Amino acid sequence: GTVMIPRIAKLFHDKKTEQMRQYIQQSYQFVWIIGIPIMMGVMAIADTFVPVFYGSGYDKIKILLPIYSLSVIPVALSNVTGCQFLIPTKKQNVYSAAVLSSTVVNVTLNSFLIPRFLSYGAASASVIAECVGCIIMIVYVEVKHLVDIKRVFSISLKKWVAGIVMFLCVKVSNEICNTSVLGLTFLILEGTII
């Protein structure tokens, strides 16, 4: 974001729309390359990571961590769409509306889900709220033909396949490995290699 915002603002000012779109596409590509493995990796190693990092008595986090990891992609997509594109192109009102909508959804869902599901409800509400904000921004840039969102998602397909393969391999190894720093290190290395 820090690198892209001034560059996109300059290209927008100079009316270099095509070059601006290319940079944004590269940012989306980066989101997929980094975000999918992080999300899938956290989901896959949670059962080993929690006891090693937190110790015993924190089993609830084994469920919360994978739930929260689902927000990695919407947060990253919102960053590219909102911070790196909408704000530098003087569409702050759309960005603000998406953030406000996300906040309203989060508060509303929290009021229903926390009393019933406690921390699981809070985690789920946060993920849903992030998705709502992301969807609002993405729909806006697609409807206004500012970014080719179909292309954004089509470039992600191979990364999703690789991420799912990595998840499955690490999850199977997670069942075999012992819960130790060495076991966790092995799982992380395995995921990195895949």
Language-model region placement:
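Hydrophobic alpha-helix feature that most strongly marks membrane-spanning transmembrane helices
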Residues: G1, H13, W32, Y54, ...
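Membrane-water interface at transmembrane helix exits
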Residues: A9, A46, V50, I87, ...
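Transmembrane alpha-helical segments of multi-pass transport proteins
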Residues: S102, F153-I194
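Specific pore-lining/lateral-gate transmembrane helices of multi-pass inner-membrane transport
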Residues: G1-L100
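Membrane-helix boundary/juxtamembrane motif in polytopic membrane proteins
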Residues: Y23-Q26, V94, V147-L157
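Juxtamembrane/interfacial segments around transmembrane helices
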Residues: M4, I38-A44, T81, I114-G121, ...
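Short runs within selected transmembrane alpha-helices of multi-pass transporters and secretion channels
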Residues: G1, I63-K90, V94-I114, S119-V143, ...
